Swiss-Prot record:
InterPro entries: GPCR_Rhodpsn, GPCR_Rhodpsn_7TM, TAAR, TAAR_fam. Olfactory receptor specific for trace amines, such as beta-phenylethylamine (beta-PEA). Trace amine compounds are enriched in animal body fluids and act on trace amine-associated receptors (TAARs) to elicit both intraspecific and interspecific innate behaviors. Beta-PEA-binding causes a conformation change that triggers signaling via G(s)-class of G alpha proteins (GNAL or GNAS). SUPFAM superfamilies: Family A G protein-coupled receptor-like (SSF81321). The chain crosses the membrane at residues 33-53, 69-89, 108-128, 148-168, 203-223, 260-276, 283-302. It comes from Rattus norvegicus. This is Trace amine-associated receptor 6. Belongs to the G-protein coupled receptor 1 family. It is a multi-pass membrane protein. The keyword Membrane applies. It is found in: Cell membrane. Residues 54-68, 129-147, 224-259, 303-345 are cytoplasmic. GO terms for molecular function: trace-amine receptor activity. Residues 1-32, 90-107, 169-202, 277-282 are extracellular. In addition to the well known disulfide bond common to G-protein coupled receptor 1 family, trace amine-associated receptors (TAARs) contain an unique disulfide bond (Cys-22-Cys-186) connecting the N-terminus to the extracellular Loop 2 (ECL2), which is required for agonist-induced receptor activation.
């Protein structure tokens, strides 16, 4: 009498014939191709979109401003996420294996954390910049100079790189979790297990700047509403050239603040699920299913691809700069001094 039971599934390993290899749990062909397309598109957009932002701001002299230099540096951080983090995380997420070695796993994790915090620092300084620009637009050029912007950029790179290097190359993040760490660190894996103390520090490092940005942008839009009422009042009277100039400057700064406010909101929405998930896992015993964790991770990664899309939607100068770059006009000697703004202020 024949048996109806199916043969047992063959256990797949990341490295066949290697002791201590991680178990491989690959997707079926259809979802696998779809995931490579979705994740790959995000990586390509993060690389080339942010490269366009950097080229635009650094090439066109009209865009050389303290705020735009901060935006270019933010784009640089997102660019490196697309180059050094997303492609390798894509393979790990889809193949459920890490094929790039233990040393590169540590380097990859450092880059992941450093560029995330670099983005957060940049957005915090941009929020301060916009707050000063909107609340005191005429004094702003003397307060937030290119030199000040350079200091902010330096801080936004040096502190995150030093922090991530110190934490992940010393191994302090796993103190007290040696047994758990040994259990998940099989050959072909790149899972970082972080103890409660460091997860709490990371969460507060995300939460505190986020709350500061929310407060700053809340004040920005309150001031913007007051300015709009004043401009409407002035518009109903015979306005002097000085009042007209103030109104145009205020209008420009409000528009810039709105666009960058959207960028901040996008960052918060992208990173909040991952931050909460990390906190829950650390204090609840790593209970999050793998697929939920991957969704949270890739929501965070996709933030690096979103900023160029936001700029393209809300910044006419960026659209024009893209056309000039893609058409090859950027190689003309006169392109650096080209006017990218349709209206004068």
């Amino acid at each position: 009498m024949g048996s109806n039971s199916s043969p047992p599934a063959v256990l797949q390993l990341c490295y066949e014939n290697v002791n201590g290899s991680c178990v491989k749990t690959p997707y079926s062909p259809g979802p696998r191709v779809l995931l490579y397309a979705v994740f790959g598109f995000g990586a390509v957009l993060a690389v080339f979109g942010n490269l366009l932002v950097m080229i635009s701001i650094l090439h066109f002299k009209q865009l050389h401003s303290p705020t735009n230099f901060l935006i270019a540096s933010l784009a640089c951080a997102d660019f490196w996420v697309g180059v050094s983090v997303m492609p390798f995380s894509m393979v790990r997420s889809i193949e459920s294996c890490w094929y790039f070695g233990r040393s590169f796993c540590t380097f990859h994790t450092c880059c992941d954390v450093a560029f995330c915090y670099s983005s957060l620092f940049h957005l915090s300084f941009i929020s301060i910049d916009r707050y000063i620009a909107v609340t005191d637009p005429l004094v702003y050029p003397t307060k937030f100079t290119v030199s000040v912007s350079g200091i902010c950029i330096s801080i936004s790179w040096i502190l995150p790189l030093a922090y991530s290097g110190a934490v992940f190359y010393t191994g302090v993040y796993a103190d007290g979790l040696e047994e758990v760490s040994d259990a998940v660190n099989c050959v072909g894996g790149c899972q970082v297990v972080v103890n409660q103390n460091w997860v709490l520090i990371d969460f507060l490092s995300f939460l505190i700047p986020t709350l500061v940005m929310i407060i700053l942008y809340g004040n920005i839009f309150l001031v913007a509403r007051q300015q709009a009422k004043k401009i409407e009042t002035v518009g109903n009277k015979a306005e002097s050239s000085s009042e007209s100039y103030k109104a145009r400057v205020a209008r420009r700064e409000r528009k810039a603040a709105k666009t960058l406010g959207i960028t901040v909101v996008a960052f918060m929405i992208s990173w909040l699920p991952y931050s909460i998930d990390s906190l829950v896992d650390a204090f609840m015993g790593f209970i999050t299913p793998a697929y939920i964790y991957e969704i949270c991770v890739w929501c965070a990664y996709y933030n690096s691809a979103m900023n160029p899309l936001i700029y393209a939607l809300f910044y006419p100068w960026f659209k024009k700069a893209i056309k000039v770059i893609m058409s090859g006009q950027v190689f003309k000697n006169s392109s650096a001094t080209m006017n990218l703004f349709s209206e004068q202020i």
